[in-house]
């Protein structure tokens, strides 16, 4: 067990999931250089550019590709720079990822994790600082997760990655540097620590 920050806990959970399951992939802007806030640092070097995928700046295309990957058997993790940009991909999130299971009688599951950083942060403009968790919670078919502590961020990200449903995973930007309790990895059985 180790004391780590909120951001480090999520990075550890994602790295462990990628080591355990080759179907877990990550895609988004600038992930190869570690992500906008450093939360993907070192992952492309470890897993390669075909599993940590740098994308063009087109949120609708990123999300559409991730929905297709999920339907084809992968477990994509989509990184949006901020939650506000997810609104550029709202059709893919609301009408495709969230509804697929219902449209195809449970046969079209979309095991997708959308990491959407929320909240105000130093030098962020108004269109980079929203908290839309309540809005997403009103969309049938989406699971909304907002971890509060480093242990939450570790356990809930692993549980989200194991879920068969699309998960809107909202980390508050102001929490990334917060150190927390020791991360209890030994208590996690298989890939799930806390069900979502």
Residue ranges and their predicted role:
Residues 186, 190-196:
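Single conserved hydrophobic/aromatic residue that forms the stacking wall/gate
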């Amino acid at each position: 067990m180790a004391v780590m920050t909120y951001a480090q806990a999520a990075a550890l959970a994602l790295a462990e999931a990628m080591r355990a399951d080759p179907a877990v992939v990550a895609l988004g802007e600038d992930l190869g250089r570690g992500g906008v806030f450093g939360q993907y640092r070192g992952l492309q070097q470890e897993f390669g550019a075909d599993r940590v995928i740098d994308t063009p700046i087109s949120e609708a295309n990123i999300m559409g590709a991730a929905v297709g990957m999920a339907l084809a058997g992968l477990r994509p993790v989509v990184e949006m720079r901020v939650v506000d940009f997810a609104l550029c991909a709202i059709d893919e999130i609301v009408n495709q990822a969230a509804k697929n299971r219902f449209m195809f009688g449970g046969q079209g599951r979309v095991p997708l994790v959308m990491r959407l950083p929320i909240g105000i942060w130093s030098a962020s403009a108004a269109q980079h600082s929203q908290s839309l968790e309540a809005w997403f919670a009103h969309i049938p078919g989406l699971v909304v997760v907002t971890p509060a502590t480093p242990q939450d961020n570790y356990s809930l990200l692993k549980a989200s990655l194991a879920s068969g449903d699309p998960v809107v995973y909202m980390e508050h930007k102001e929490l990334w540097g917060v150190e927390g309790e020791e991360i209890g990895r030994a208590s996690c059985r298989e890939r799930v620590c806390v069900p979502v």
